[in-house]
């Protein structure tokens, strides 16, 4: 049991060390405007999105080249009162910041981090690790060239670490899909 706990701890530390740690700040200035600033340790491509409380996309921008920072003055004055979510995706890390607009005043909440799952394929074993911050019911499916081979509900556990021995599968291309809530992560492997 001690060995398993050590392996899990080492695996979790490897994942934590491999992800980006971008910093997202929103500084309200005046008249419904705010400076949005992103800083990242390493140059990377990123996607900035702003969604309203219904999930409707209000703003979207993808970087055209890798960079370590982004700064833009946003004008929120034309938006209706309500809750919004500003998110920035840098590689496999997403930083979310809730923003509430009420009578032209911006209130900015704390940053929340989300990480894409980690997939690895080696020696006929598929390993998956995922931190389910939102507590969504998770589902895993494995599809081959001939259709669905495996489909299972994984529950709502926060820390999901799985290993699948796929040695019995024929050679070919396979698609692994981990989904939960409105998120879907796809991993392709060739056996």
Describe the residue ranges of each PLM region:
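Start-of-domain marker
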Residues: 17-69
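Short, compositionally biased P/S/T/A/G/V-rich stretches that sit at domain boundaries
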Residues: 19-26, 102-118
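Short beta-strand/loop motifs in extracellular/secreted proteins, especially
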Residues: 44-46, 136-138, 174
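Short, glycine-anchored, charge-dense loop/turn motifs used at functional sites
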Residues: 52-57, 84, 143-149, 174
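Surface-exposed interaction/gating patches
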Residues: 118-149, 158
